[in-house]
A protein has these predicted regions:
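Extracytoplasmic metal-acquisition and chelation regions
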Residues: 1-206
Length: 206
């Protein structure tokens, strides 16, 4: 909503984890509950491992190539932390209307910067993204079909994207694939740690 702060802080794993810990500690004092120091340490380690992996994953990609076209402005915290330029079709609110001028602006960007993919999102209606695809096709650009990004909600509980750290992993894999054409693998140390502490589903990463 215009005039309100960006609420999408969960796309920065370190910032979000510290927020969750602070809220839990505050609530525990109000409700006279105990917050496990071991659990806090586990979450901080998990956030650090994911943060390091995402940073290392983007490291080989030149900054000028790190451009993501998405359905709405949900990934600014992610972009700021990892040096990714975000070009959303809509603003912070998914209720805003797609403007033809913005569609045309993004089509120009896609053609000029040789962007290979645009992202729909699991929680956003994708008509605007379809318009981008059509506009790009008219300019001779055949955009790749990519899985939608998780923006405002997690995925189904039985999928990797249904868990917080899994959501970050899947988004990163798909973003890097769209930019570089390569699908990175999660570091073994991060995967083992997350699975051992119930923070990541034990399924094969694509």
């Amino acid at each position: 909503v215009e005039g309100y702060a960006d609420p999408h802080t969960w796309h920065d794993p370190v910032f979000w984890t510290e927020t969750v810990i602070a809220v839990a500690q505050s609530m525990s004092q109000d409700l006279d509950l105990m917050v496990s120091a071991d659990r806090i340490a586990t979450l901080r380690t998990a956030a650090r491992l994911i943060d390091e992996w995402i940073t290392q994953t983007f490291a080989p990609i030149p900054v000028e190539q790190r451009i993501v076209v998405s359905a709405h402005d949900a990934f600014s915290y992610y972009g700021k932390r990892y040096g990714v330029s975000l070009e959303p079709l809509l603003g912070l609110s998914t209720a805003s209307e797609t403007k033809l001028a913005r569609v045309n602006e993004l089509v120009d960007l896609i053609a000029e910067r040789d962007i290979s993919a645009v992202f729909s999102e699991t929680s956003v209606e994708s008509a605007g993204i379809a318009a981008l695809r059509e506009g790009a096709a008219q300019r001779g650009v055949d955009l790749r079909s990519m899985p939608p990004l998780y923006s405002d909600a997690l995925g189904p509980a039985d999928k990797r994207g249904g868990q917080y750290f899994g959501m970050l992993i899947e988004n990163t894999i798909n973003i890097v694939d769209a930019i570089s054409g390569e699908r990175p693998s999660l570091s073994p140390s991060a995967q083992i740690f997350l699975e051992a502490h119930g923070l990541l589903a034990t399924e094969t990463l694509l």
